[in-house]
Amino acid sequence: MVVLGVDPGSRLTGYGVIRQEGTFFTVLSCGVIRLHPRSSHAERIGQIYRELEAVITDYAPECVALETVFLSRNVQSALKLGQVRGAVIALAMNRNLLLHEYAPREVKSAVTGKGAASKEQVAFMVARMLALNPVPEPFDVTDALGIALCDLLRGGSREPFKSAGQSRKGGMSWSQFVGASPDMVIRLFQK
């Protein structure tokens, strides 16, 4: 099984491709997509899409593992991160790849055994589990490798991404959620 882990960001996007054969893990590629600070957000999203598409072409992963959005006090940052995630999701769907999403605490727990682990602890354990010396930098790279490892260690146990209108087993789609919980929806354009 080959998994592409992605740590999405609007300035740096980390990626890591890991192959699992039995109990052995091999890093096929890892790195960071550095986005030019003067580029527009749309140009950055395009760059992320193109560079990850090249990684997918070169290494043919069967699955993309992606970190979910954590809640942020900065709405602009959360929106930009959501748009980057959308580009990664669109790429995975366009290439007919499985897509699994993991919360940051779930990734940390899978890699270190502690959901509140620091980035340094995650980097140390990722490097140790994958026999990487030196530890890849920046943390975006080890985070992406950790996301891929989480998926492999969990056996791809996450339910594949569902499109709008479909629900996960026992869950609900976004439209169902909005209908059932209107008070939870942020109204951007109120009269």
Curated annotation (Swiss-Prot):
InterPro entries referenced in this protein's UniProt entry, alphabetically: RNaseH-like_sf, RNaseH_sf, X-over_junc_endoDNase_Mg_BS, X-over_junc_endoDNase_RuvC
Amino-acid positions noted as binding Mg(2+) 2 in the UniProt annotation, renumbered to this chain: 67
UniProt xrefs under Gene3D superfamilies: Ribonuclease H-like superfamily/Ribonuclease H
Binding locations of Mg(2+) 1: 7, 140
Cofactor(s) it depends on: Mg(2+)
Pfam families noted in UniProt: RuvC (PF02075)
Keywords for the protein's UniProt record, in alphabetical order: Cytoplasm, DNA damage, DNA recombination, DNA repair, DNA-binding, Endonuclease, Hydrolase, Magnesium, Metal-binding, Nuclease
Enzyme class: hydrolase
Cofactor note: Binds 2 Mg(2+) ion per subunit.
Keyword Nucleus: no
Record-listed E.C. numbers: 3.1.21.10
Cellular location(s): Cytoplasm
Gene Ontology BP annotations: DNA recombination; DNA repair
Catalytic activity: Endonucleolytic cleavage at a junction such as a reciprocal single-stranded crossover between two homologous DNA duplexes (Holliday junction)
Active site (record annotation): 7, 67, 140
Family: Belongs to the RuvC family.
Subunit field text: Homodimer which binds Holliday junction (HJ) DNA. The HJ becomes 2-fold symmetrical on binding to RuvC with unstacked arms; it has a different conformation from HJ DNA in complex with RuvA. In the full resolvosome a probable DNA-RuvA(4)-RuvB(12)-RuvC(2) complex forms which resolves the HJ.
Function: The RuvA-RuvB-RuvC complex processes Holliday junction (HJ) DNA during genetic recombination and DNA repair. Endonuclease that resolves HJ intermediates. Cleaves cruciform DNA by making single-stranded nicks across the HJ at symmetrical positions within the homologous arms, yielding a 5'-phosphate and a 3'-hydroxyl group; requires a central core of homology in the junction. The consensus cleavage sequence is 5'-(A/T)TT(C/G)-3'. Cleavage occurs on the 3'-side of the TT dinucleotide at the point of strand exchange.
Protein name, entry field: Crossover junction endodeoxyribonuclease RuvC
Species per Swiss-Prot/TrEMBL record: Pelodictyon phaeoclathratiforme (strain DSM 5477 / BU-1)
